[in-house]
Each structure stands twice: as structure tokens, then as C-alpha cells.
């Protein structure tokens, strides 16, 4: 029994940093930055009072299983750098929140699992944390932001990266930086939850590959029962291929494999030739 406990401890240790970021820990991880001083004031928000700080954006954070936000600050005269560190229930939730706020106006940067920023802003995810940083400084503080961001990312999760399922998506035709994770309401259906997506292009047409994690084969079956009730289809539900005739989203080819439902979705509701190859390739990796 002791040997089993030691083995469990060995495997769990690497994950401790993913669940133990207290406000005091986060503040202690802030690096020294020339000319800037870490403020002694730290604000902490939870699901009950997050609206007090970010108001209209709070519902999306809660949908992504937000747990706690720690707000910290550097000061340099009248200038400041604000860091908001959002802790979520899982790394997938943190990645999902980050991906929902990607902006085409920002540059991608090598911080954490993925990052975006400019001369006054930096946003990234690492472990189960989503971090937003910005400054009111009139000059370019991108270097300072990246120094702070990299130091925090290293402490939160030194090996930060995309969720394991995202790494399995086929490379051919993949649009860079288009990966996302949706906790619920994928393509407008509340029962389509825990969905990983990636955008693709093929022969001038765009589409998404998606993977729904049902948690178990029974979980996927329950999702399909709800979907078939919506589409009024009476197809036999068994593992393998199925065509969902969604009256709002067009025909959606899916493939059920174990705890996963893999599919192809096109915003115009079109069927795209050749996507069945990508569908099968992805399913075989799961």
C-alpha cells in the first residue's frame, strides 16, 4: 500500500502547481523589473463578485468555470502595469477562455501555452490560469510585459501548451492559432459541451474539425440522443459514422469513437469533399 501511495505522489507532484496558485503565491512570483515597483495592494475576486470588476465580461468567465481572479500591479510614477490572473477549474477551461478572446489586432508571442500582445498589452494561458496584462504607459512596455509574463508562466506551468486533444488534430490545411475549447453551446446547442475545435481550409472553403469529449461512451450516446431528438432523426445509435441533419447548421458528418464524437462543421452548412479523410485521421488518434 505504501508503494502505491508513493507512486501516486510521484505522478501527482507535477500537477500541484496547476491547482495551488494562491494570491500570495502569485504575488511572490512577480519578477523584479528595472524602474518598476510591485504594489503592495492585491485584490481578489471570486464568482460572486467578479461582476464588480469586469461586469459584462463576467458571464463568459463563469461559463468557462472561473474560480478566482487575483489583480496585482507594478508602478512607476504615474504609470502602472496591471496583471489579472484568472484561475479556472482546469487547463482546458483556461485555454478556452483565452481562445475566446483572441484578437486579430494583436501579435502572437512566445509566452506560456500561447500568447498575444502589443506594446501595452499581453494575454496568455498557462496551466489552469488565464492572464491579462496591460499598461497605461505612453511608451512601449512590451519587453517589461513579456519579462513578467514569462516569469509567471514558468512558475504556473513550465511546460504550458495546448490541451492534449488539440495536439492530435491533423496538420494538413490547419489554420494557425485557430484552436479553441468550448465548454457549452457549441454551434448553438446547449448539450454540445466540452468541444475542442480547429479551423481548416481546403480548396478555398473553410470549415471546422471538432472533438466532443463525452467523458465515456454512454456520455456520447446521451449527447446523440439529445441531438437526434432535435433533428427528429431515428438513426440507430452505435459507434461509427453518422450524418446529423441539423436544420440550423446543415448536414454535419460525425464519427463516434469511445468517449469522443468527432465531426466536421461548415458555417454555410455545406458538405466539403475530402473532409472524411481528416475526420478518420483524427478519430484514429483518439
Where are these regions (language model features)?
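Positively charged n-region of N-terminal signal peptides that target proteins for export
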Residues: 1-7
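Bacterial N-terminal signal peptides
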Residues: 7-17
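Soluble, non-membrane globular domain cores that form compact, hydrophobic packing
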Residues: 18-286
Amino acid at each position: 500500500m505504501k508503494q502505491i501511495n508513493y507512486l501516486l505522489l510521484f505522478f501527482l507532484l507535477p500537477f500541484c502547481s496547476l491547482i495551488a496558485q494562491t494570491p500570495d503565491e502569485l504575488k511572490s512570483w512577480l519578477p523584479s523589473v528595472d524602474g518598476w515597483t510591485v504594489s503592495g495592494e492585491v485584490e481578489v475576486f471570486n464568482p460572486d463578485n467578479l461582476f464588480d470588476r469586469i461586469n459584462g465580461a463576467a458571464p463568459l468567465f463563469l461559463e468557462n468555470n472561473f474560480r478566482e481572479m487575483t489583480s496585482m500591479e507594478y508602478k512607476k510614477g504615474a504609470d502602472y502595469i496591471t496583471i489579472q490572473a484568472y484561475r479556472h477549474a482546469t487547463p482546458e477551461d483556461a485555454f478556452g477562455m483565452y481562445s475566446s478572446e483572441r484578437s486579430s489586432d494583436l501579435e502572437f508571442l512566445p509566452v506560456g501555452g500561447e500568447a498575444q500582445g502589443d506594446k501595452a498589452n499581453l494575454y496568455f494561458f498557462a496551466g489552469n490560469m488565464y492572464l491579462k496584462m496591460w499598461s497605461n504607459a505612453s511608451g512601449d512596455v512590451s519587453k517589461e510585459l513579456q519579462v513578467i509574463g514569462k516569469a509567471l508562466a514558468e512558475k504556473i506551468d513550465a511546460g504550458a501548451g495546448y490541451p492534449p486533444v488539440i495536439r492530435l488534430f491533423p496538420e494538413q490545411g490547419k489554420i494557425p492559432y485557430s484552436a479553441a475549447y468550448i465548454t457549452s453551446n457549441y454551434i448553438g446547442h446547449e448539450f454540445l459541451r466540452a468541444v475542442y475545435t480547429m479551423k481548416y481550409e481546403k480548396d478555398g472553403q473553410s470549415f471546422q474539425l471538432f472533438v466532443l469529449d463525452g467523458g465515456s461512451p454512454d456520455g456520447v450516446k446521451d449527447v446523440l440522443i439529445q441531438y437526434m431528438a432535435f433533428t427528429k432523426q431515428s438513426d440507430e445509435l452505435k459507434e461509427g459514422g453518422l450524418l446529423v441533419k441539423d436544420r440550423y447548421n446543415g448536414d454535419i458528418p460525425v464519427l463516434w469513437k469511445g468517449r469522443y464524437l468527432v465531426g466536421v462543421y461548415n458555417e454555410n452548412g455545406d458538405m466539403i469533399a475530402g473532409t472524411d479523410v481528416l475526420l478518420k485521421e483524427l478519430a484514429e488518434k483518439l
